[in-house]
């Protein structure tokens, strides 16, 4: 999958959200899958989950985002 960079949710398609911490579009399903397969963490908000999932699991990008 192509990583989609974003500044806000409007830059993302298909109902994806923009994760502010690393500016990458992500689906809720992808986030839930990450959590389910790896860890379960308490989330204060959905955005917490997105940031966590991206940084720890889904997008370990070679250029150090």
From Swiss-Prot:
GO CC aspect terms: extracellular region
Species name: Ascaris suum
Functional summary from the UniProt entry: Inhibits carboxypeptidase A.
Pfam families cross-referenced by the UniProt entry: ACI44
Lineage: superkingdom: Eukaryota
Protein name: Carboxypeptidase A inhibitor
GO molecular function, one term: metalloendopeptidase inhibitor activity
Matching Gene3D superfamilies: 3.30.40.170
């Amino acid at each position: 999958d192509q990583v989609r960079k974003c500044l806000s949710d409007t830059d993302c398609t298909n109902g994806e959200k923009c994760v502010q911490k690393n500016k990458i579009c992500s689906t809720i399903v992808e986030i839930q899958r990450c959590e389910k397969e790896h860890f379960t963490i308490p989330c204060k908000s959905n955005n917490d989950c997105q940031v966590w999932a991206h940084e720890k699991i889904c997008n370990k990008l070679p250029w150090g985002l």
